[in-house]
């Protein structure tokens, strides 16, 4: 696990409606209730779009895994999509779980995220609480995990390029 402070990434302005705090999610194109976990998710989205150059239209949030033909009602926080070479459909290639700051990233959270990656056929999995980040490349064919330094750029993810932690 490595330090990666997402606090440097700007989030949309928080607005108050009916006494509750909301933030505009530019990927989902709607106001979302502002929670500590949502703050981390919005910082990660800014990082994905601005730093890793992930196109907004290739990001999915809080979508039931059943949408991707997985028998599950679970909803990963963020999915990064790619075009399937055979069908042309958008399919997940990375799963990201965001937790509120100071959340202990324990075995349960890691197992949950890796289970999502396996079920969805994702080659990349990332977990963060906004301060710490854990990233893995998932070799789906031989069920191996490689700890990597950080999530690669979108282009590198498409090409299976990553930097392993030695």
Task: Describe each region flagged by the PLM.
Residues 1-124, 131-166:
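A short, conserved, highly charged catalytic patch centered on acidic carboxylates
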